[in-house]
């Protein structure tokens, strides 16, 4: 068979008040290389032992749910996306699994179908849509219907501060309230509306202001990520537009002017020595498939 490689970018979600809706693709990647057929699924990886190497692996289990008739293969998986750090590692695996099914099963899925299927698995469109489409996405899940709009944000730089500690998404969601007062919801959604409008009009200072005024989730998650306020203060002093939790955390996501991202990252690294400071870019391609050569490996 022609060697098949799938590359899926990481993602950050929420961007402050865009809870379960706004996502941005990032320049960290999951790679899947499909090798020969086998009598059973085998996943070759160098991750921790808890990551399955058989059909229970999230990539494979997703692929088999999308196309149950798939023939088992040996696949090799590598990734520089940190696990359980709020950078879309599970979303990237789901997206990779859908594409694996699409390619091996010759399903000819459209982009919209991929987004719909991925959202059904993930429960919200922000991470998966960003990984599929690249760039910045704004999505909505209304019952079973998914609507997604993609916009370009090439003038922005990205910095991620990644702690050593993991934070399970379920744990981070457990601190959120079950009920949100109506007047608070009005206030929070208005801030989110302005965030999206500012993203569309490239008003980056307004984007930075709005991403730091979330009411939906960050106030409840501060106890889990206590360094957020001090990182936010320093980043602003160093010239960043704005700072927010990356997804459910514990990583911190910072938007900067593109040309200042390296300088700001170096300044932050000198202050927050216990965290890994990554200077990233927004990925504008989304998922890519290469049938001729193994990309990125």
UniProtKB/Swiss-Prot annotation:
<keyword id="KW-0791">Threonine biosynthesis</keyword>
<dbReference type="InterPro" id="IPR006204">
    <property type="entry name" value="GHMP_kinase_N_dom"/>
</dbReference>
<dbReference type="GO" id="GO:0009088">
    <property type="term" value="P:threonine biosynthetic process"/>
</dbReference>
<dbReference type="InterPro" id="IPR036554">
    <property type="entry name" value="GHMP_kinase_C_sf"/>
</dbReference>
<feature type="binding site">
    <location>
        <begin position="82"/>
        <end position="92"/>
    </location>
    <ligand>
        <name>ATP</name>
    </ligand>
</feature>
<dbReference type="InterPro" id="IPR020568">
    <property type="entry name" value="Ribosomal_Su5_D2-typ_SF"/>
</dbReference>
<keyword id="KW-0418">Kinase</keyword>
<keyword id="KW-0808">Transferase</keyword>
<keyword id="KW-0963">Cytoplasm</keyword>
<dbReference type="GO" id="GO:0005737">
    <property type="term" value="C:cytoplasm"/>
</dbReference>
<dbReference type="InterPro" id="IPR000870">
    <property type="entry name" value="Homoserine_kinase"/>
</dbReference>
<protein>
    <recommendedName>
        <fullName>Homoserine kinase</fullName>
        <ecNumber>2.7.1.39</ecNumber>
    </recommendedName>
</protein>
<dbReference type="Pfam" id="PF00288">
    <property type="entry name" value="GHMP_kinases_N"/>
</dbReference>
<dbReference type="InterPro" id="IPR006203">
    <property type="entry name" value="GHMP_knse_ATP-bd_CS"/>
</dbReference>
<comment type="similarity">
    <text>Belongs to the GHMP kinase family. Homoserine kinase subfamily.</text>
</comment>
<comment type="pathway">
    <text>Amino-acid biosynthesis; L-threonine biosynthesis; L-threonine from L-aspartate: step 4/5.</text>
</comment>
<dbReference type="InterPro" id="IPR013750">
    <property type="entry name" value="GHMP_kinase_C_dom"/>
</dbReference>
<dbReference type="GO" id="GO:0005524">
    <property type="term" value="F:ATP binding"/>
</dbReference>
<dbReference type="Pfam" id="PF08544">
    <property type="entry name" value="GHMP_kinases_C"/>
</dbReference>
<dbReference type="InterPro" id="IPR014721">
    <property type="entry name" value="Ribsml_uS5_D2-typ_fold_subgr"/>
</dbReference>
<comment type="function">
    <text>Catalyzes the ATP-dependent phosphorylation of L-homoserine to L-homoserine phosphate.</text>
</comment>
<keyword id="KW-0067">ATP-binding</keyword>
<keyword id="KW-0028">Amino-acid biosynthesis</keyword>
<dbReference type="GO" id="GO:0004413">
    <property type="term" value="F:homoserine kinase activity"/>
</dbReference>
<keyword id="KW-0547">Nucleotide-binding</keyword>
